[in-house]
Amino acid sequence: MPGEGKTFAHKRETMEDRTVLHRMIAALVILVVASHVTGAEKGGLRITNGWFTQDGRVIWGCAQHNGWWGGYRQGTGWIRQYKVRTALCRRAPGRVGPSFTEDLDKLTDAMVRYGYPGFEHNYGLWYDRRRDNHDVQRRTDANVQPPFLEQPWARSEEGTAWDGLPKYDLERFNPWYFARLKEFARLCRKKGGILFHNFYMQHALLETPAHYVDFPWRPANCVQDTGMPDVIPAANVFYDVTNDARRELHRTYIRKCLDELGDQTNVVHLVSEEYTGPLSFMEFWIDTLIAWERETGKRLHIGLVGTKDVVDAILADPVRGPRISTICLSYWWYKADGTLFAPQGGREVAGRYTGNLPRETTPQSLYRQIREYRRLYPDKAIIQHHEVQLEKAWAFLMGGGSMIVARMQYADSVPPKQPWEPPDEYIAPPEALVIQPTYDFIRAHLAAALPHMRPADIVRDNEDRTWCLAEKGKEYLVFALRGGSVTIDLGETPGQRFQAQWFDPRSGDLSPAGVATGGGTASFTCPDDRCRALWLHATNDL
């Protein structure tokens, strides 16, 4: 089984023709370059003025959040109450395609085509589909039911885990799992996508007993003494690295992930899916990443995800804060009434109270949250888990947000199949179709300009529902949430002429809006009372 792979020794490089002096000079060059480069290597992912970019072009849109369990099983189809999502490390022997072993090449093609160029990965809740009905029964045999969700840890040759298979060895790793992630990351760099890699999956530690019974670190499932409890809640114990054995197991695993993915420029590293853990573990995780960077001379995109108190503490840290390239604002928000929902870290708050519940937000409250952090940290990219709704997607963009992480299920086959089956090809998820016109508009007209644009307070009417991104004197993008009149201050660009166009985010249509001249205010009236965007582009041809 792929999960029982051996640990491979690093290949040693022999360079007998090099002198000792040559080696020292090369090492010094690497260290100097690494100390000054703020993004990935040339051709890979960079953070430019708070935007994800590659080769000078913005990467904006949705990110698919991966599937945790399930997949197509012959004779039963999908689980009707749970249409599964894409999973990079799902393995269906002999079957390739949606809901089986994903075709990574076709998947990444679909991502950049259909408006979700990002993908957020974490390992699955259990290995095989016998656990899909969420029972906690100990398996008496190894009669597994594919497809499998491969885990990062390898199986040992000792004992029997709760799922009837050999116990895990937490110091050995699954080569198939990491090969899949490396190949996906390589394709992301090639095509302009991003892998958001979660090292852990907190959901298994808190939500329900069925999610924890097969977890590799549970005492019944591994050969090491992890000190973990036999039942949930288990998160705070898992994150307690004052236990020497558990601390070293964490460090070994974290470094394995970095050894496998650290060369991949289009990867943003995140501590965990649904992380509501303590500040202490976040500090330990970041310190382990920074130590690896120092040892290797390589540079990582470190993402920060957690509760507001933990996120704010790290960003205020004079050592750790500057190393953060990406902020995830998923586990706190402003409600529609303006009050703050912000649970504290380290309280074992489950995902059903943060990432999974319907959010009582408005476009205005979402804009407020994103804009606040963009103002405080203008050079860091911002992502957030959120439902994909047109007005909120635009509020997120106008506040300076880079990518909306969404739990997008496979689209139904066209025409629908009976019984319920996955599509034969990767077609656009319904959620991605919501922003498809906007995604196409940005790629066609603003891909090179958006990295130089920032939220700007130059709107002079309906400020509570009209927002602007601007590169002064060159490009202006104004979003009117409810249509109506749009007035912007162009006083700092006297004499400059701008071509103005209306953009309909529902249809993707562009229509003329006239000409504006800098040096004062410019006013426009939306074609109707629905949301519209106004695009002003500097020109000398008018």
What are the functions of these language-model segments?
Residues 45, 52-98, 231, 235, ...:
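Extended substrate-binding grooves/exosites of carbohydrate-active enzymes
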Residues 45-326:
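Active-site mouth of glycoside hydrolases
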Residues 520-522:
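Short strand-edge motifs at loop-to-beta-strand transitions and within beta-strands
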Residues 4-16:
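Short, Lys/Arg-enriched N-terminal segments with co-localized hydrophobic residues
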Residues 29-37:
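Hydrophobic h-region of N-terminal signal peptides that target proteins for export
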Residues 248-252, 261-427:
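Extracellular glycoside hydrolase catalytic/binding regions
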Residues 371-381, 389-514, 525-542:
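Aromatic- and carboxylate-lined catalytic core of secreted/periplasmic carbohydrate-active enzymes
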Residues 13-25:
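Bacterial N-terminal signal peptides that target proteins for export
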